[in-house]
Amino acid sequence: MLYKLLSSYITLTLLFLLLAVGAAIATFIENDFGTASARALVYDHLWYEALLGVLALNLLAVIHRTKLYRFKARFLFHIAFVVILLGAGLTRYLGNEGIMHIREGESASSFLTTKPYLQVTLHEGTSPRTHFFPLEITAWKNRLQKSLPTQSTPLKIALVDSFIHKEGLGVSGYFDLELLHKEKRIKKRFTHNLASSLQKETLWLDDLQVDLAYGPQEIPLPFSLSLKAFELKRYPGSRSPSEYTSHVALVDPSQKVALEETIFMNNTLSYGGYKFFQTSYDMDEKGTILTLNQDPGKEVTYLGYALLFLGLLWNLLDPTSRFRVLLGRIKKDSLSLLLPLCLLSPLASSLYAQSDYLQGYLKEHQKGSQELSKGFGELIVQAKMGRMEPLNTLNREILYKLSGKSSFLGMSADQVVLGMLSNPRAWQGVPLIRVKTKPLQELIGIHPQNRARFNDFFDENSAYKLQKEVERASTLPPSRRGSYENDLLKVDERLNIALMVFQGSLFKLFPLPSDPHHRWLNLKESIFMLEGEEAKTLHQATALLLDSAFERQYFKGIEALQTISFYQYKKGNEVIPSESKLQAELLFNRLEIFPHLTPAYLVLGFLVLLSAFGLLFFPPLASHRVRVSFHLLGWILFALHTLGLLLRAYVSGHAPLSDTYESMLYISWSGMLGALLFFRHSLFALSASILMAGIFLFGAHLSHIDPEITNLVPVLKSFWLTLHVSVITASYGFFGVGAFLGSFALALFILKDHLKTPLDKPIHQLSQINEVSLILGLTLLVIGNFLGGIWANESWGRYWAWDPKETWSYISILLYALILHLRLLRPKHYDYLFSLLSLWGFGSILMTYFGVNFYLAGLHSYAQGDPLPIPLWVYALSLALALLSLIAYPHRHLQNSDKGNS
């Protein structure tokens, strides 16, 4: 009976659900009450660990009952999870981790634990006795009751009260201890916060001295580390760290070992079973903070990872695997195409009414400044975080921030910014600043126009019209800000950017000679800080450039640009990128590949989708030539997409996976690649992939996602991170395709009972294609997650931190594993159920990707506890999909494939 229960697929399903729901609840507990509460109630609690243990037993029992060991690939990746759980258990129960702080010229032979302890020292007789009790205060019941023997009556210690308050990513609060010895009773309060320092108190209970301490426990090491020097490198002209290194000496007298090593991010020191990681440093840059761990489970865990990766990849190649069998069926059931025609028309634009002078100036500036502006954009500028880039890149970011466009009134970003810099008074009268909401337009006095002039924001007394409203909106938590408040704060930011352009403070164009940090100066700073004949020539050239643009004698400014460029290369050549990188970045900016790809993907996706539906009703219209044409168009768009990613990677110096914008570009790319390689025989799958690519690109260019190219922080400079992010985000593309295919199938369920055309077979084919997509997605998601474990362990010594993003990724694995194993339960109406779950399962991916970033506080998050309001379109889309699911339900029966084993 027990064996039957353990080897049941129903047990497996329940375990997946319980583990996923428990982890999901824990992420919200952590957001509201802190990490310690989430760990105490879920992750570290016996009930959750017991579920993981039962899951391991369930896997072993299922493997034995189904004789899965006969199929080597499937056996390898299933048994790998058991090995990984075993390694995790060894690390959790036998491992140790802590923090070591060393100042330059000093040494340390002990470390502090990451978890807090209550330390009780009893002074009796000749030697005091110290007891350690782990005590981490959480939002729920905290228990501590101890009875310690003394020479007379026992000392009783109890925790009687506690309170915590969430503050950003941390918590603060207090707890009260009550001590009883003989007839003496004392109550003592300790504060609880993120500080690692030890809190100490000495109490007397009659003749018994008791020393209490709360904080990390100090653990001695059999060797010592001394810090010879700490080195911090920053990005040019910036305070942002590029790399920090600890030069240490290790001495072990017992083994007669003395060696010198360097520790920096992603480069560790291993000795005596301990591994040291560079974590942080003192603000005066004279001390280092290292984390260390002792991990007896590492070899077992890495063995599990190796088996997992080998098994999953082998499974994709194994001709007997579910993946290859389905792929074979899809090829046999190839669908043809129908080509509908469609006409596109350009959008018209209108000019605002302006004064005769301003209209004349703008018209002349548009025509006459093109050559000068092009050279202006080719100057080098030091941007945020010290990134060196063509001025054209910064100009484009400025114009996009101000107007939401990459060009304005027929002028390039370089022309606009040069005009604002050289003739601020004229440009303060140009309606350039975007204002979305009607109440704000009315407050400024521009309604019904949606663009405001700089001058519109000030009344006749030069008072800022938005001052009070901005102050009010700034004090509101994000969850209480409506569209008006959000637009208000964004417009205020745009106005400040415009002001900085007019003042020239954004443009760090001039290298400061002999500066150790390679700092560059803006226009105003250069006047006061650059001296000598060269500086005088430079100032004259700058004045000539601005005067020539102001007087509209643009040819005069060409020589001035050459003088400025010569000075840049002479004084700042050490940090200026190569000519090939600069030209590549200018080409990348000029092509605007991703904004142009967005409508192309969407239009092509809808054309293919219309063709797929048309084929169901007019099969004779199918054409091999049309199918090939669609595929060729898909490959052309994919090639352009690939070119854009390669250019961005080249100019940034790192893989384009470092932020939300870049990862969305990559997700859409991976979805297209999967469709072109695996789904070329299905129009529905091809259209789903193309639409998914277009929607992700569209999302990447929404106003709250920043496309700016930036330098990497030190911890992100890792091969394992690049591999982890690229693989895991690629999986999102396949899950997105699965969600689209699920929605298409549900739509066909609704249509099948109202049309004469039989749709049962196409629905079943869609389910098979969908399953292939989800298998690919889950394979990549699992591999990507465990590659992330390798990166985290090699970077700071912890595979898994139960951070909300990690946790929701783990939840996604559980949910999609459940969806793909659902057929083993042989449910009725399997195709409907599978389509439904593949659609709604994508919600876990969206939560992993967007929800955690903006609604939960964590290491991967942009939120700090106050969530942003959920956009109305999310509710509308959810309602529409819910209606689709409900309307399809009465039509869920198919004639030939009701069981999941079909």
Curated annotation (Swiss-Prot):
Membrane topology qualifier: Multi-pass membrane protein
One GO location term (cellular component): membrane
Location relative to the cell: Cell membrane
A matching Pfam family: ResB
GO molecular function, one term: heme binding
TM stretches of this protein: 9-29, 75-95, 300-320, 335-355, 602-622, 659-679, 731-751, 772-792, 832-852, 868-888
UniProt keyword Transmembrane helix, yes or no: yes
Keyword Cell membrane: yes
Function: May play a role in cytochrome c biogenesis and may be required for maturation of the NrfA protein.
PANTHER family the UniProt entry points to: CYTOCHROME B_B6 PROTEIN-RELATED (PTHR30071:SF1), HEME EXPORTER PROTEIN C (PTHR30071)
Family of the protein in this entry: In the C-terminal section; belongs to the CcmF/CycK/Ccl1/NrfE/CcsA family.
Protein's recorded name: Protein NrfI
Gene from which the chain derives: nrfI
